Structures are given as C-alpha cells and as structure tokens.
Amino acid sequence: METFHNIGSSTDWIVMVVYFMAIMLFGSYFGRYTRNTADFFFGGRRFSWWLIAMSIVATGVGSHSFVKYSAKAFEHGFSSSMTYINDWFFVPFFLFGWLPIIVYTKVRSIPEYFEKRFSPSARFLATILLMLYMIGYIGIGFLTLGKAVLPMMPETLTLLGTSFDITLMRAVIVIAIITGIYITFGGQTAVIFTDLLQGFILIFAGLFLFVLGIDYIGDFGIFWKLLPVEWKLPLAHYNYPSSFNFVGIFWQDGVAGSIGFLFMNQGLIMRFMATRSVDEGRKAAAVNILFMLPISAIVVGNAGWIGKAIAVADPSVVSPNTSPDQIFVVVASIVAMPGVFGFIMAALTAALMSTVDTLINATAAIFINDVYRPTKRFLQRKQKEKAINDKKELFAARIASIAITATGVIAVLAFKNFPTVYEAHGFFHSTLTPPLVVAIFLGVFWKKFTPAAVMTTFIGGVALMMLGARYPGVLIAPFDHGIVMNPDHPYSYIRALYNMLMCFGVGVLITFTTQVQKNVVTRLKGFENHKQIGYGIIGLDVLLFVMVAVNTGSLSFLMSAAILIVLTVPVVVTYFGHYDEVHHTTGLTSWTMETARERFKGSKVNDAEGDIVELNWKIAEGEGNIVRLSDNDMKRMKANAGDLLYLCDKRKWLGGLKSIHAVFGTPHDEDGTVYITEEQQKGGLFVTGRVLTAEKEM
C-alpha cells in the first residue's frame, strides 16, 4: 500500500489551527451552562428536537465514518453506503420501547436500568461490559483521528535540536490532549452545541468535496462512466471477499451494530436524554433516520468514489495502490485548493472529535453513576449536603474524563494492526456488543426474562464467545455462510452471528427453564450445608471461567467447562437472588409504559390537550421545583396543581438552552405571569424582560 506524508500547505495548517481554536472557545463558552452533574452529563434535559438531531449527525457521521466509508467506497464503490442506511428496521423498537423507558425510569446510565430491571449483580456485570465497549469505541476514534492526520504530518519533526519520528501513537497522544480539554471542562451542553455547529459544517464540507471532485473530473457523466460496473452496485457480494461481504456486514452492522448503536451507546442515549421530552427525542430520531442518514451516506463515501474515478482516469494522480484509510485525505488534497483543503480536513477531524468527546463524556457518566456513587455507598461514607456532593461529583467527573481519555489512547494498541479502520471497527462491534445487545433487547421486550437469564447471558455467553475467538475455524465456521476465513483476522464480521446466537440461545434457554432452576434450588435448600454448596458452586464457576479466559486445556474440555457454567450460574443466581417479577417488570418493560409514565410524574397522568401560553416571570419565594401560574392561565393549559410543565425562553432559535422543568403549584391571580424562585431563574438562565413560554408536559 502506498502511504503519504506532508500533504497540505502552511495555509491549510493555519486554517485548521484557527478552526480548532474557534471550536474550543465555542465549547468552553457553553461550558458556563454546566452548574451540576445533570448539566454536565445530560445538558439539563432541556433541548429541542432539531438541535439534538443535528448534534446526533455530528456524532454519527463523525463516528469514524469519513475515513472508514471512504476506504470501502474506494475499494468497492456504492456498496460502501449499504451499512449507513440499515438502522431503520430497529428504530420503532427504540422509539416506542427503549427511549421512553430510559426517560420515564429516570435512569442515568444503562447499567442502572439493569439494577432496576434485574439485580445489583446484573448492574455490576453490565457496567464492566459497557465500560469495555465505550473505552474500545474511544480507542477506535483515536485510531481514526491518528490515521486521518498522519498523511498531513512530516515523517520527522525537530524540536530543540532533537528529531522525533511522527508515528501513529504519537499523533494519537497529541490529539487526545486536544480532544480532552473542552469535554473535561464543558460537559454535555458544550458537546451538544459544539456538535450542532460541527454538524452543519461537516455536512457542507462533505457535499462541497463531492462538488469539487465532480468538477475536477469534468462532470457527473464522466464520473459515472469512469466507475467500473461493479462499483455501481448497491450491495456487496454475498460472502466474499472476507474483508467486505454482504452477509458478514449484515450481522455485524445491520443487527449487532444497529442495536448496539441505538440501545447501548451511552453517548447516543445521553443525547436523547438531553431532549426536553420523549416526543422531542422521537422527532430527533425520526428526522435523523429518514433524512440525515441518507444525506450523510453521500457525505462520508463520496471521496472514495471520486478517488476511484481519478485512479481509473489517471493512475499517476491517484494510485490504485493508495492506502484506503488515506484516500479521503489524498482526494481532498487533489481537488481542493490550499485553505479549502485545510477547511475540509478541519471538518473531518472535527467530525471524529465529535464522536470521541461524546464517548468520553458518556463513559465518565457511567463511571460516576455506576462506580463512584455505588462505591461511596458501599464504604458508608457520611452523606453531606446535596450541593456539596454534587460539586464533588462534578470534580470527579472531570477527573474521570481525563483518565478515560488516557485509557482510550491505550486501547488504540488493540486495533492499530488491522488493515483498515473499517475492519477494526467491524471486529470491535462483532466482539463486544452481543452480550449487552441481547440483554437489553430481551429485558425490554420480554417480561419473562429473568436475572438468572441475564447473568448467564453475561457469564456463560461471554465464555462461549471467548471460545469462538480462540477456535474460529471450529466454532464459527459452521455459521460462516461460505466466507473464507482470513487467518490473520478470522471472521471479523460473521463472528457477530455466532456471538449473538450464543448469547441469545443462552438467554432464551435459561428463561424457559426457570421452573427447573427453582426446583433445583428447592432441593438444594434441603441440605444442611446448602449455603456452603452455593458458595462452592460460585467458586467452581469462577475457576471454570478463568480457565476458559486463559485457554487452559483442550477445546473439548473448555467447551464442557463453558456448558457447565451455563448450567450452574442460573442455579446460584436463583439461590442467592430475590426477584419479584411484578416489581422488576412493571414500568420497566415495553408492555407497562403507562405505569412508567405515572411513576415518572408521581401521580395520574393528565393528557388533556391544552394551549402553550406566553408569560412574563417574577422572582418569588417558593418550595422545591414548584412554579405558580394564574388560575386562568392554568385553565387555558388544562393543567392542575401537581402536573409537570416546561418553561422556556420564547426564542425558538435557542433550542431550549434557557429552560427548566417544573411542577404546577397553587394558582395566583396575576394573569400572564409565572412566579419562579431565584434558583429556578439561575437554572433556566432566564433573562430579565424576556418572555417565556409554558407548556404542560403531563
């Protein structure tokens, strides 16, 4: 493969530096709206759908897309876009199942849902798996950023008389420092508004690059004729080559990846949790899927198509042997003049940073919610005033962001030897998403799914997955659909099918044998030393899992060990656990949504349609989160005392930045005026003299 260095001019570097300084100042400015951990992680649950939709574009498109889809577009043509528009068939499950549940249950992280739905033990294992997933995702992001900027860097750099080789890892370290600065001090509000800006810029830059490329070639007709027929096909070949095939990509990206991105990507989930309501989140998701992703498919893939056309027309300009991961940079440098190339590269790196900063913020949220707080409770430290605790947690969140950034840099080492970012990302998704994907999906949509089933999915399913990774030619081969195994990177994509089947099969098997487990536990409790037996089984399972993990023994022995884990884990979970199906499913599954809404409000839901009213505001004494409107205004809104409302600055272009959620209190007699407390005014960032709109939520 032909690789490049020193692409670009000093003008391009000046443009990029100015761009990044502007972005960091922009993010730091909105960091002033971060007053507590709710703002740091969730943006205060205040934003409008259009702002979140555009912010999601920056995160989704920036999710390594420019580099990896341009690479596959250069190698395979229009079929590179097939993975970019395959989320739609899981969207209804997200819109009407998972999204309302995570909002109405008021969970702050995905593992917290596992505790409410199953048990604290399930939360513990979910935290481990999700942290691995998120840190791995950050590593992929840093890898992509490094590969994007490396072609622009010289091979060596001399500082203070000492020469340094510019390597991938050194580039990644510098990028990580820049990326971590404003996310550490800004939080989710800074990320959302920075991504809003970058979302517009990267869509424009990607489409502008396509226009420049077509103009460079001549016109669209010439471009179309230059592309080989195979490059014009919408789908890849069914089962070849091993590096890019339809069936492997379907299971890796279309199933495991799509559910993983929608259901377990904490960064994406936090964007939706920052919307002001479930309906606003649904609008954002629908617009993203129906309109933004098809446009984005062109934005992220066109550099590869242009590169292939130029390579066919004049191989001396773009060599057919150009490294696929560098094709975006190479094409942009050819078709764009100095300065414009710098702007396009700034958009690329900004898009990638959008993903990384979101993931760092999300992983810090998991750490605070599922490691820091439970650890404090476990150590039984004396609880202090909430405001003091919140300040400490905000400081801990910022320290966690720094530590997670450093860990993400280390994670790059696990992926840097793959031929392309696309294959590294595919392997990552196939390996780390299946256990959590299966657990979330079955937990949300199947009331019968038990703690024993989810724990066995996590432990037994992962044991079987590790065996598949160790012995792919034996265990994954029966599911490979005729794909030839690459011995260097065996079954990067189709392993997702094997892993999903193992986890799904274990979860379903244990759920259907729940009564058998209860019978075994009943018999076990008949022994005098039943507790010792229970602890002995736990010790045996730990030993067997470690043996599978370190590959101690033959395949037949390890497979027997994994099966024994699957059979014994549900017994000990049932023995030691206390599970009430009604308590642990009501309001926590898709079938009990009305109960979830009532719990969210704290009383019966009022769905009567009322008006949205415009109000002036006054500071008044009050309690808690209560605001007071006039009796006439409440009648117009068809609201009662105790209902929930959303107060927002009238200026719609702010997207909900200046807003609060509150509760209707007893009415007063001053029409057109709402009484709020000083703390509510600070939280809503309301400006003196500015009119507010009040909307009843439920």
Regions from the PLM with identified roles:
Residues 1-605:
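Membrane-embedded helix-loop-helix hairpins and adjacent transmembrane boundary segments
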Residues 56-60, 70-71, 631-633, 649-651, ...:
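Short glycine-rich, polar/acidic loop-and-turn segments at beta strand-coil junctions
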